[in-house]
């Protein structure tokens, strides 16, 4: 069962492995009991000519049925990369990685940030001073450098990126939650809850946090966009998602040299995709800010 689960995970983030041997050809013809093909060559010269006997094609009982069963014509809307892989397919698989990084990183940052911010804002005093010191130290380190340091410490890999990005984004959440909690805990209903003898955990989780979530939702949308951008940067540097797992940043890394070699679309298309996705989540954050009317 564990092996099947791992296979499903690999298929989701890497794509389904093609077990068939595919040979690109530019021409073919049937000659006697042979299938004669001309292999595709992108250098403007004729490719190698090869003959395949009918005995190799076990699905076809007649050599004339081989083209129908074994030869297919494929179109690549965005072309292929330098390894002959469909760029559109890799882009579609790559968006799964970007969205997964965003969701998991934001989830990790919310868990840590809400917990630390709520504790600091509610208890105050030395507890607040210690937590704010940790927040300020973390805040002073450039985000990308901190992510790179954590990634190098944990090792290259997909899950390491989740943890590294999540551990660098909690400080913003913590500062916002702390400010909200310090304001909300002065409300009369919180004082009433204390008078009724409710414990601190219940007061924080049932009365304070539910009334402090509007700004957190907005910052989460912004953090989602930032996580996608950071992951793309890590993959471009070679310390993010590792091959053969397709990542938009990794696709740019593999093909940025083609910008001056006549095929700039190989790097421009994933770059535009990153820009569009990040912009979309920033617009979502702005819309949430207006809808939730945080300022009022």
Locations of regions flagged by a protein language model:
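Membrane-topology segments of multi-pass transport proteins
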Residues: 1-83
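Alpha-helical transmembrane segments of integral membrane proteins
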Residues: 80-296
